[in-house]
Amino acid sequence: MDKFYNYNSSSHQALLSFKVKPNSKQNLISNFVIINNIQYLKLSIKAIPEQGKANAEIINYLAKEWKLSRSNIEIIKGHTHSLKTILIKNINEDYLNLIINSYIK
């Protein structure tokens, strides 16, 4: 099974996989889901999936939740799909592990 994240220590970048549910009651990251033997973090977002509103809210929410600059968060795959790959730039591996461990129950 592929895990939901991959860290590159030479570039200090991480790729994370999310299963996004737009038009939710609240913005929330909650545990994992497995689809086609790939692990995804579940992410609920209040914004509707129209004209990039949900994607913008994903970036804003992750930046606020993880105390990162919005410019260091980029959706690189899945702009119009619920399965998204998000690039996190300029992140320390220890800090990434701290973030990840907060969602492992």
Curated annotation (Swiss-Prot):
Any single GO CC term annotated in Swiss-Prot or TrEMBL for this entry: cytoplasm
Cystine pairings recorded for this chain:
none
Q: Which Gene3D superfamilies match?
A: YggU-like
Q: Which Pfam families match?
A: DUF167
Family, as annotated: Belongs to the UPF0235 family.
What is the designated name of this protein?
UPF0235 protein RrIowa_1526
